[in-house]
Amino acid sequence: MVKEYKTITQIAGPLVFVEKTEPVGYKEIVTINMPDGTTRRGEVLDSSSDIVVIQIFEGTTGLDKECGVVFTGETLKLPASIDLLGRILSGSGEPLDGGPRIVPDQLLDINGAAMNPYARLPPKDFIQTGISTIDGTNTLVRGQKLPIFSASGLPHNEIALQIARQAAVPGSESAFAVVFAAMGITNEEAQYFMSDFEKTGALERAVVFLNLADDPAVERIVTPRMALTAAEYLAYEHGMHVLVILTDITNYAEALRQMGAARNEIPGRRGYPGYMYTDLATLYERAGIVKGAKGSVTQIPILSMPGDDITHPIPDLSGYITEGQIVVSRELHRKGIYPPINVLPSLSRLMNSGIGADKTREDHKAVSDQMYAGYAEGRDLRGLVAIVGKEALSERDVKFLEFADLFEDQFVRQGRNENRTIADTLDIGWKILAHLPENQLGRIDNKYIQKYHPAHRKGQ
């Protein structure tokens, strides 16, 4: 028998305070029965005292103390089905595309379960994003969690959509899917995401969750968990390789801070909850490959660094949990370069596991190292030129200075719809490395120079 309580004591913003009349669980789902016969859903934020704090998903407009409260005894669940592919849903899993509700094969708890470390397999297969600065110098590996560190006003949304359109595992027999979750976005951004997915045909192999800025903060906490649960279902029940793109983790962390304040928690660094590290880990650690499972879950969380500060708690803590970072540069963006990814502070810690003769190409590591070294030296020389002028440089230094410009203009810069294969990326690398004297290519084995260098290829 379902018990309905009319013990609401206070309504404040998105929160409803209810007098406790029975044991209530943390994160338990609550149904609010409205006087007009409609219902709203909420989630228990705090049940430690005699008053239960409930955050309402749809907001509290129109609620009063006469509304009925039903504690369901359940946590939030995702209606999981292969029919999720091709759908656009709200942050709490409700259809936004005008389609029918999902008829579930299973109802899955969105909080998931911890993955046994012994059951994990080390990531080792290359994922091609079609973006040279990622594939060539900061390679994404299947099962990895590789965040993109961006900032306000930079084109991280465009980069996210380009990856969603182009990502693939070359040579794999398993199907590839993308789960895209956007948190705290404006209506304009939501329309942009939806139209891009539909227009480019990427929606056919994608599940999209959109949480708007004017949606309740509790839904922002739920959205990435919905997305990851959908990804795990597709990976482990249907053997798919799933790439999860989460944007923007900063909005998620702001919602965490808001929820912490609502519960009167003692704040940690810059007002964020002391448990934010653990909470972020519950998201990031759901990436991986499990022994015996055909599928895998790979993550690209995107976060905008407040004030361009890489030491801010959100990127700082994310960096401890994840396996590298892709850094989006305001300097390159000002130059009109897209995608404005700065390879020097960027890093993929698992890159060496996913490249080489049987995965990408035998010369990949050497070309990447040589381009990185050449670009770093060219950038240093720009600082010197600003002081002493270009005329003071040696002929060798001028070559490296010009190499840095070529690297940005030909390797980093590419079209928003340009999908480069790994062979294209490495060939562009060789093309710009040919600008340097051969005796300066000290990081590349001579056999690769003889095989791939444009000067020697012409003679073959």
Curated annotation (Swiss-Prot):
GO BP annotations, alphabetical order: proton motive force-driven plasma membrane ATP synthesis
GO molecular function: ATP binding; proton-transporting ATP synthase activity, rotational mechanism
The keyword Nuclease is assigned to this record: no
Alphabetical UniProt keywords: ATP synthesis, Cell membrane, Hydrogen ion transport, Ion transport, Membrane, Transport
InterPro entries in the cross-refs: ATP-synt_VA_C (IPR055190), ATPase_a/bsu_AS (IPR020003), ATPase_A1-cplx_bsu (IPR005724), ATPase_F1/V1/A1_a/bsu_N (IPR004100), ATPase_F1/V1/A1_a/bsu_nucl-bd (IPR000194), P-loop_NTPase (IPR027417), V-ATPase_su_B/beta (IPR022879)
GO CC list: plasma membrane; proton-transporting two-sector ATPase complex, catalytic domain
UniProt-annotated location(s): Cell membrane
Protein topology in the membrane: Peripheral membrane protein
Gene3D superfamilies: 3.40.50.12240
Main location: membrane
Job description of the protein: Component of the A-type ATP synthase that produces ATP from ADP in the presence of a proton gradient across the membrane. The B chain is a regulatory subunit.
Subunit structure: Has multiple subunits with at least A(3), B(3), C, D, E, F, H, I and proteolipid K(x).
Family indicated by similarity: Belongs to the ATPase alpha/beta chains family.
Protein name (database record): A-type ATP synthase subunit B
Organism: Methanosarcina barkeri (strain Fusaro / DSM 804)
Gene behind this protein: atpB
